[in-house]
Amino acid sequence: MYAVVASGGKQHRVAVGDVVDVELLSGEPGAAVNLPAVLLVDGESVTHDADALASVEVTAEVVGVVKGPKIRIHKFKNKTGYHKRQGHRQKYTRLKVTGIETGKA
């Protein structure tokens, strides 16, 4: 069974046991996180109806905070000697998916 969840403006296809990096979330390592924005669930059949997805819960455990790849920014203006170099590394929260509950009895 897998689910498609939205976090940080991105969509992630997750299954139980998957480790996924999402935009930075608050929470200490070992804390439980609920991912409420479920867009699709695939079990015995694919579910994408909004009413049925309202009862679906995807739970995950915070593994830690990791940094993404270094991005180098270089601004340059011709004939003036202007150079500006800057770098950036985005922080991500690493999650391990612990459960997908469909809410069916």
From Swiss-Prot:
Disulphide bridges, residue numbers: none
Any one cellular-component term (Gene Ontology): ribonucleoprotein complex
The keyword Ribosomal protein is assigned to this record: yes
Oligomer status and interactors: Part of the 50S ribosomal subunit. Contacts protein L20.
InterPro entries from the UniProt entry: bL21-like, bL21-like_sf, Ribosomal_bL21, Ribosomal_bL21_CS
GO biological process: translation
Keywords: Ribonucleoprotein, Ribosomal protein, RNA-binding, rRNA-binding
PROSITE patterns: RIBOSOMAL_L21
Gene Ontology MF annotations: rRNA binding; structural constituent of ribosome
Function (record text): This protein binds to 23S rRNA in the presence of protein L20.
Source organism: Parafrankia sp. (strain EAN1pec)
Keyword Magnesium in record: no
Family: Belongs to the bacterial ribosomal protein bL21 family.
NCBIfam families: L21
Protein name (Swiss-Prot/TrEMBL): Large ribosomal subunit protein bL21
